[in-house]
């Protein structure tokens, strides 16, 4: 009984950390949704993809909170949403940072092709049983695009600082902390969620800041 109680306690701690992460991402979705509503029609495909980049981790974290707190049978759905966040959400944010930093105004069909391409490469590497390697490559590439987008605004410092802060938290969470086992008395997945919680608001701030400093648009 004691072991079962301890397991439930740690399960509830993960539900709590997932819930806090979901709330942080949801706040980002609300704020970015205002940008989408006020954007010009040609800018809305980009803002839609940015919103998707935050909505996927918000959904994954919300389902995770319910899974670890109430309904363990939601594990499959939670895993699917978590993979979508990794293989689709973060890359979309990296591409958005690139387009904003370079002042590129990609049209809806361009964003559609990028979405389809990400889905196609996911299926390809799944068939090749190389998803772990592809995930690492995709996430590191996305973080580099975020940093590049911030660097393109130099000598304005804030975009680069935001990109460094968000990327640093994501790298530390993914490569150092991980999600399996414990770090002292703390479950690693809870610490992982705690690091992602400030990372996503920093990413939202970066997107808004890059959009505000965009001075011209090159239509592709």
Describe each model-derived feature in a short phrase.
Residues 79-150:
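Membrane-proximal helix-loop-helix units in multi-pass membrane proteins
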Residues 56-63, 116-127, 166-179:
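Aromatic-anchored segments of alpha-helical transmembrane domains
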Residues 25-39, 64-111, 204-207, 211:
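Internal transmembrane alpha-helix with an interfacial aromatic "cap," most often the third helix
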Residues 151-220:
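C-terminal transmembrane-bundle signature of multipass membrane proteins
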Residues 18, 51-58, 113-117, 143, ...:
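Residues within membrane-spanning alpha-helices of integral membrane proteins
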Residues 8, 73-76, 124-136, 180-187:
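Membrane-interface helix caps and helix-loop-helix hairpins in membrane proteins
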């Amino acid at each position: 009984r004691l072991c079962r109680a301890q397991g439930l306690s740690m399960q509830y701690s993960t539900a709590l950390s997932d819930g806090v992460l979901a709330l942080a991402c949801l706040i980002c979705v609300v704020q970015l949704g205002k940008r989408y509503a006020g954007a010009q029609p040609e800018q809305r495909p980009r803002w839609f993809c940015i919103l998707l980049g935050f909505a996927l981790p918000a959904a994954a974290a919300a389902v995770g909170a319910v899974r670890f707190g109430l309904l363990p049978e939601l594990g499959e759905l939670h895993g699917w949403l978590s993979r979508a966040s990794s293989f689709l959400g973060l890359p979309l944010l990296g591409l958005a940072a690139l387009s904003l930093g370079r002042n590129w105004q990609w049209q809806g069909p361009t964003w559609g092709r990028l979405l389809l391409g990400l889905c196609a490469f996911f299926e390809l590497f799944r068939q090749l049983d190389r998803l772990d390697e592809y995930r690492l490559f995709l996430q590191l590439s996305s973080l580099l695009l975020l940093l590049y987008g911030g660097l393109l605004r130099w000598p304005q410092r804030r975009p680069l600082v935001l990109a460094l802060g968000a990327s640093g938290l994501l790298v530390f969470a993914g490569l150092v902390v991980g999600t399996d086992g414990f770090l002292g008395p703390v479950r690693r997945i809870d610490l992982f969620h705690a690091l992602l919680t400030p990372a996503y608001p920093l990413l939202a701030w970066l997107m808004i800041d890059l959009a505000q400093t965009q001075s011209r648009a090159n239509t592709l």
